[in-house]
A protein has these predicted regions:
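Glycine-centered hinge/linker elements that transmit conformational signals in sensory
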Residues: 180-181, 219-249, 292
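Extracytoplasmic/periplasmic substrate-recognition and gating elements
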Residues: 32, 242, 279-353
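Paired acidic/hydrophobic, glycine-rich loop segments that form the ligand-binding mouth/hinge
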Residues: 91-94, 260-265, 270-272
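Conserved N-terminal structural module of periplasmic/extracytoplasmic solute-binding proteins
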Residues: 1-102
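Short helix-initiation/N-cap motifs at beta->coil->alpha
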Residues: 69-79, 172-178, 246-256
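Hinge/lid segment of periplasmic solute-binding proteins
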Residues: 97-152, 286-291
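Short, solvent-exposed loop/beta-turn-alpha elements that line the ligand-binding surface or hinge
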Residues: 113-127, 170, 189, 197, ...
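Extracytoplasmic/periplasmic solute-binding protein
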Residues: 137-146, 151, 175-223, 261
């Protein structure tokens, strides 16, 4: 071999190695539970995620997205924590509501604000503020909402019709709610035992939200129970509880058609309303849902609790820009967020999707 080729060989080999490395696809990993967080049937998470991957890969040649299948929601937190301990966590991951504080406090998630500031395609004003706040900590955004589920007031329409009571409007108040519950809670067969009830499962948490207040300060350092809005919320919850005369109600009581009102997640309404799931839940009465009743304080309203599944990026990802693009594809595009409604049991956190015809 000539002296020239001996000198050039290392550079040629290096060039070949670089070309081979460049031709290999970048592989991103996404983590998600395969079943419903809200424990309802009919969710198609694989259909949803596979569609997102197909869209993302079509727009990003030489990038592949992989995932571990079969992780049930009850095992998801343990699985994800274990992957972090092994240094093998996914680049992009679904974050359960109860896990967000843990991951943000341990600096496990990458801050998203730098990506959003440089990305003209993302407009945070397009999200519902409450859903967006679920992924924020100390003024910084660490996750974006994937889907959210509000709490609604379910109504036994059959029972109201039997009692000649019209369905309340969506702007109803505590006073109307209490009056109806008081009217509906009674002994229907004359045996001296109350067997029909106005409401089941309405407690202090629902009352606090309706009155526009919370139990603790935003920093979690102070209990606010001694403030007037909190006091009136607790008092109202106590009055509602006392209406049932100490009777221990259950899901079965509602399913039997003996309760007029019950707060439930919108995901349950969506999943159980269609046939055949509907007959598994309640076959002897018609039901519907409306907004929760408004509290009496100045900050009160027809507000409800909101449960939000989020998407975040690992702090240790080696592909932060591509991970952001994948997260954005799922959480911020109209195409994928429309599929939240068709394939999952929640609603989109984007105004333009949820409020579209």
């Amino acid at each position: 071999m000539s002296r020239y080729w001996k000198a050039a060989l290392p550079f040629l080999l290096a060039a070949v190695i670089i070309l081979v490395a460049a031709s290999r696809p970048v592989v991103l990993h996404i983590g998600f539970p395969c079943d419903s967080y809200w424990n309802v049937p009919g969710e198609n998470y694989y259909t949803f995620i596979d569609a997102a991957i197909e869209k993302f890969e079509a727009e990003h040649p030489n990038v592949k997205v992989e995932y571990t299948s079969g992780i049930r929601v009850e095992d998801y937190t343990e699985w994800l924590s274990g992957q972090y301990l092994l240094g093998q966590e996914p680049d992009v991951m679904v974050i359960l509501p109860e896990d967000f504080v843990i991951f943000s406090d341990t600096a496990s998630l990458r801050e998203l604000d730098p990506f959003m500031k440089q990305d003209p395609e993302v407009d945070l004003s397009g999200f519902y503020p409450a859903a967006l706040q679920a992924g924020a900590d100390k003024g910084k955004q660490y996750a974006l909402p994937l889907e959210c589920v509000p709490q609604m007031m379910f109504i036994n329409k059959t029972l109201l019709q039997k009692e000649h009571i019209r369905i309340p409007d969506n702007d109803w108040t505590w006073d109307e709610f209490y009056s109806l519950c008081e009217q509906l809670t009674r002994d229907t067969d004359g045996d001296g035992i109350v067997d029909q009830f106005g409401v089941y499962d309405y407690g202090w948490e629902e009352a606090l939200v309706a009155n526009g207040c919370s139990l603790f300060s935003e920093d979690g350092q102070h209990c606010l129970l001694n403030q007037s809005a909190q006091e009136s919320a607790m008092q109202f919850a106590r009055q509602i509880y006392q209406l049932n005369a100490g009777t221990d109600l259950s899901d079965k009581t509602f399913d039997e058609g003996r309760v007029a009102f019950r707060p439930m997640l919108f995901s349950e309404y969506r999943s159980y309303e269609p046939y055949p799931w509907r007959i598994k839940r309640s076959s002897n009465f018609e039901w519907d849902c409306i907004a929760m009743p408004s509290g009496t304080s100045a900050g009160g309203g027809n507000y409800s609790r909101l449960s939000t599944l989020m998407l975040g990026i690992s702090q240790r990802t080696k592909h932060s820009r591509l991970s952001w693009e994948l997260l954005k594809t799922i959480a911020c595009t109209e195409e994928m967020q429309t599929m939240v409604y068709t394939e999952l049991s929640g609603v989109s956190a984007l105004h333009r999707v949820t409020e579209s015809d």
